[in-house]
Amino acid sequence: MFVTEAYAQSAPTVGETHTETPAVGQPQPEATHTETGVAHGAEHGASGVFPPFDQSTYASQVLWLAITFGLFYLLMQKVIVPRVGGILENRHGRIAQDLDEAARLKAEADTAVETYEKELAAARAKASSIGASARDAAKAKADADRAAIEAGLAEKLAAAEKRIAGIRDHAFADVGAIAEETATAIVDQLVGAKVKDTDVKAAIAAASAVKGA
């Protein structure tokens, strides 16, 4: 417990002995009491007041409160606040770094998606071009093959027609010879005279002309 200066001056010194001088005719006291007992009695007399509510110690309480608050303020300012500030600053820096990294990764992802879309569009265009080229090539080949087949068929048809015409001419020639021989034989049988070949051929030719007309 803290004591004030007035209380210290008014209180007797601990350990100081006090000897009472007996009056004339009084017996000598057997023992002297010390100031320690007086102080002890004073403490017992003041023990009924709760120390924080003791008005005699308000000044010392305020002083120690100010000292304690000052020390706590210095502790907060020099130790706790810098540590908390450092932690917050580090966390803020880490968050900012994470945000920058996330932005960088997002930009890379966007670039990759854009590149993929461009490559996909180019691949589709190339596939379409290849398909169109293949269709054009197939059509051209089909047209060429058809033209070649048609030309071959036309050539074969012309050859066949020529052959048929030759066979027909040959057949007609044979028929003419047979007709001449037959006509000569018939005339010989009917008339009994030999007919000239020129006359028979002329008659057959005239008959053929009339039949064809």
Swiss-Prot record:
Keyword Phosphoprotein found: no
Membrane topology term: Single-pass membrane protein
Transmembrane region(s): 57-76
CDD domains tied to this protein: ATP-synt_Fo_b (cd06503)
Quaternary structure and interacting proteins, as annotated: F-type ATPases have 2 components, F(1) - the catalytic core - and F(0) - the membrane proton channel. F(1) has five subunits: alpha(3), beta(3), gamma(1), delta(1), epsilon(1). F(0) has three main subunits: a(1), b(2) and c(10-14). The alpha and beta chains form an alternating ring which encloses part of the gamma chain. F(1) is attached to F(0) by a central stalk formed by the gamma and epsilon chains, while a peripheral stalk is formed by the delta and b chains.
Cross-referenced NCBIfam families: PRK09174.1 (NF006612)
Similarity-based family: Belongs to the ATPase B chain family.
Protein name listed in UniProt: ATP synthase subunit b 2
Taxonomic source organism: Agrobacterium fabrum (strain C58 / ATCC 33970) (Agrobacterium tumefaciens (strain C58))
